[in-house]
């Protein structure tokens, strides 16, 4: 309990003399999906940092690759006078994006030369930290119409290869022969060549770390499971990391889509020499040892990876901490979940700094509706540091944690308090609409429409059929955005520095499908405010509103 009091007391003591000078982070994202770049931009905005991306036309779209040559030229020609860090997706630079990294269209020599050019740029700017992230190739090929007849058989075949490698059980050998008969030999050869090329490039990347061309690298395990060809790949990478002596600068984490967020957090925390301490509360302790869908490590190990890679560190008991992460694990037992929910609600109501990561995800990647309802009640949504619940456990934790880290950092370093508080609320609203409403309600409706059209498929849809789906998504999701905003945010008041503001409007709304499928959505907007009142002079030093004077609380804003 004493440690919790210290946490609250620390909030009351935060006071800034001036706002930080605006800085930039240059980010080469994984691809053009919002999760690859827009989420990181929203997080950076909390700290008044502009996360700058290459022109979107260079980033590709689904199976149309990005343009690495143009992107490298963009990176070369940027003005580095205000650049705090550079974050590079090696899959975009080397191959043209995540989807293109899963096929063998780019030779190793071309990919390695492109990485070498990035190394030359780093040498021209030795004062700027360079971070990189690279996908350890997932088991299954990208879902397209062209591979619909054999991709599942191929992924099951290579999974069984690893099971057989470890156990030598004869039944696996027979199943492998049956599956192999259903996979075109040319496609299996392409798949194996692609894996070998990607692995060779990652060995090259480790040497670049050894040569100080990158300060820190995340090797992100794309959608996986406990068995598969990625396991021996990881084992070989770990051996090479140890041989090169770069273990402190290379981290292997679950997931890939979230690592722009993770590295934005790490870059900012390292720039300001701060490591937040994160107390973790699980909805069911037994869930710590479960392996979440699409991951190869148990939840606790995956969580530690995301925390450490982001620049934070976990506190698993009630020691001193900067915020609490409430983690809803897969399939928690009902009595334990109810207790978890009660503590979460109490902490939010008391104003403690709270982040929520919901990894109790349904098969379609949607969060727990019971948790959503608890956060909906009593306007609890906008009283948190962050929330996420989308796609995979790694994606979720690697979104909620960086946002909480960066918001707290922004309070410490002295940035524009109104921008910080607005960016936080925009991020929270975005998460609930994007993560929960879209995948729970709008996306199923889009799939129903797709299934009703003979010239459309869930893998990819084009032309007039795509326009119909896109229009449905725009109209339907706009309704949820409007409702969530009106019922949770409109008219709510908050403090930014010594000024109180009221949320008045939702502006610049943009909703569209970024790729020719309904799997994800691009959602953009800005929240408008008006000034309500200033604090009384006696309370200006602490930044505590008159109603909270004498009480150390989370809600006041320095």
Predicted regions mapped to residue ranges:
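N-terminal signal peptide c-region/cleavage motif recognized by signal peptidases
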Residues: 15-17
């Amino acid at each position: 309990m004493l440690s919790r009091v210290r946490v609250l007391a620390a909030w009351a003591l935060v006071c800034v003399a001036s706002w930080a000078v605006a800085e930039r982070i240059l980010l080469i994202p994984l691809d053009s999906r919002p999760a690859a770049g827009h989420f990181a931009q929203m997080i950076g905005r909390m700290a008044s940092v502009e996360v700058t991306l290459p022109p979107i036309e260079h980033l590709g779209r689904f199976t149309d690759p990005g343009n690495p040559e143009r992107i490298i030229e963009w990176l070369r020609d940027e003005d580095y006078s205000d650049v705090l860090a550079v974050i590079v997706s090696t899959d975009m630079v080397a191959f043209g994006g995540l989807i293109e990294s899963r096929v063998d269209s780019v030779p190793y020599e071309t990919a390695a030369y492109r990485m070498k050019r990035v190394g030359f740029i780093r040498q021209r700017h030795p004062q700027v930290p360079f971070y990189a992230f690279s996908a350890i190739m997932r088991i299954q090929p990208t879902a397209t119409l062209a591979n619909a007849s054999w991709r599942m058989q191929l992924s099951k075949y290579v999974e069984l290869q690893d099971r057989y490698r470890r156990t030598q059980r004869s039944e696996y050998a027979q199943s492998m022969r049956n599956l192999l008969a259903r996979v075109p030999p040319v496609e299996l050869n392409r798949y194996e060549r692609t894996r070998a090329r990607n692995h060779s490039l990652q060995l090259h990347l480790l040497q670049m770390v050894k040569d100080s061309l990158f300060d820190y690298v995340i090797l992100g395990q794309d959608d996986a499971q406990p068995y598969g060809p990625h396991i021996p790949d990881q084992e070989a990478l770990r051996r090479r990391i140890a041989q090169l002596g770069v273990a402190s600068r290379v981290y292997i984490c679950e997931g890939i889509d979230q690592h722009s967020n993770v590295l934005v957090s790490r870059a900012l925390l390292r720039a300001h020499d701060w490591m937040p301490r994160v107390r973790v509360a699980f909805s069911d302790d037994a869930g710590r040892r479960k392996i979440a869908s699409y991951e190869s490590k148990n939840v606790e190990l995956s969580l530690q990876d995301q925390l450490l890679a982001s620049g934070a560190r976990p506190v698993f008991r009630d020691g001193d901490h900067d915020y609490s992460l409430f983690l809803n694990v897969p399939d928690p037992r009902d009595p334990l979940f109810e207790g978890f929910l009660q503590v979460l609600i109490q902490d939010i109501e008391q104003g403690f700094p709270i982040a929520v990561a919901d990894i109790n995800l349904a098969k379609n990647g949607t969060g727990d509706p019971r948790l959503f309802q608890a956060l909906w009640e009593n306007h609890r949504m906008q009283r948190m540091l962050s929330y996420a619940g989308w796609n995979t456990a790694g994606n979720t934790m690697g979104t909620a944690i960086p946002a909480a880290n960066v918001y707290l950092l922004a309070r410490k370093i002295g940035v524009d308090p109104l921008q910080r508080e607005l960016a936080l609320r925009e991020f929270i609203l975005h998460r609930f609409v994007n993560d929960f409403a879209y995948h729970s309600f709008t996306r199923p409706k889009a799939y129903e429409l797709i299934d009703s059209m003979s010239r459309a498929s869930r893998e990819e849809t084009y032309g007039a059929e795509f326009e119909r789906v896109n229009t449905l998504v725009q109209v339907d999701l706009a309704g949820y955005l409007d409702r969530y905003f009106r019922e949770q945010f409109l008219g709510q008041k908050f403090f930014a520095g010594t000024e109180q503001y009221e949320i008045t409007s939702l502006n610049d709304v943009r909703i569209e499908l970024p790729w020719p499928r309904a799997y994800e959505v691009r959602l953009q907007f800005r929240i408008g405010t008006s000034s309500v009142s200033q604090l009384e002079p006696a309370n200006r030093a602490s930044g505590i509103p008159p109603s909270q004077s004498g009480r150390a609380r989370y809600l006041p804003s320095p």
